[in-house]
Amino acid sequence: MHLFTQTLVRFSSLIADGGVSFNPDIFETNVVNLAILTGGIFYLGSNALSESLVERQQKILGAIQEAEERLEQATERLKESKTQLEQAQLVIASIKEDAETTAKQVKSAILTEGKNEIERLTSAAKSQIVTIEAQVRKQISDYVVSLALQRVTLQLEGKLSDAAQQQILDRNISKLKD
């Protein structure tokens, strides 16, 4: 803007000093030559310019068509991608659902198996306890019987003869075997 202002100021100072003036003589100023030259340029150049503009217009239209085709292809690919995404999301949801179902089934199976194992171990422990109790009772009973026999034997040693003692012992031993 500043340059334009400076140019106007210089041009107006030239006009004011008389450096620039209008010459009305057509032949001296070459106005006719300039008009012929300008007309020839327009006449001859218009065809070339017209052809150039038509060619440029065709290139632009071709580029627009190509861009529209690429846009349609991109839109189609976008639709396909969206469809694939939806299908992938459905597959993912199905996989998640299957995984949750499988996890629940595995959890249930593990819990059931654990309960069964606990019941089996408890039953085995109870069975062992019953067996051990029976063994302990038998041992206690055997011990009590042997103590009683010892006591009776001691008491009878002083009162019974050897033959009578032997008969009592044989009878008691046969009862124990039964």
From Swiss-Prot:
GO molecular function: ATP binding; proton-transporting ATP synthase activity, rotational mechanism
Transmembrane segments: 34-50
Highest taxon of the lineage: Eukaryota
Keyword terms of this UniProt record: ATP synthesis, ATP-binding, CF(0), Chloroplast, Hydrogen ion transport, Ion transport, Membrane, Nucleotide-binding, Plastid, Thylakoid, Transmembrane, Transmembrane helix, Transport
Location relative to the cell: Plastid, Chloroplast thylakoid membrane
One cellular-component annotation, GO: chloroplast thylakoid membrane
UniProt topology in membrane: Single-pass membrane protein
Pfam families on file: ATP-synt_B
CDD domains registered for this protein in UniProt: ATP-synt_Fo_b (cd06503)
NCBIfam families given in the database record: PRK07352.1
More about this protein: In plastids the F-type ATPase is also known as CF(1)CF(0).
Function: F(1)F(0) ATP synthase produces ATP from ADP in the presence of a proton or sodium gradient. F-type ATPases consist of two structural domains, F(1) containing the extramembraneous catalytic core and F(0) containing the membrane proton channel, linked together by a central stalk and a peripheral stalk. During catalysis, ATP synthesis in the catalytic domain of F(1) is coupled via a rotary mechanism of the central stalk subunits to proton translocation. Component of the F(0) channel, it forms part of the peripheral stalk, linking F(1) to F(0).
Family: Belongs to the ATPase B chain family.
HAMAP family in the record: ATP_synth_b_bprime (MF_01398)
Protein name: ATP synthase subunit b, chloroplastic
Organism (species): Ochrosphaera neapolitana
Lineage: Eukaryota, Haptista, Haptophyta, Prymnesiophyceae, Coccolithales
Gene that specifies this protein: atpF
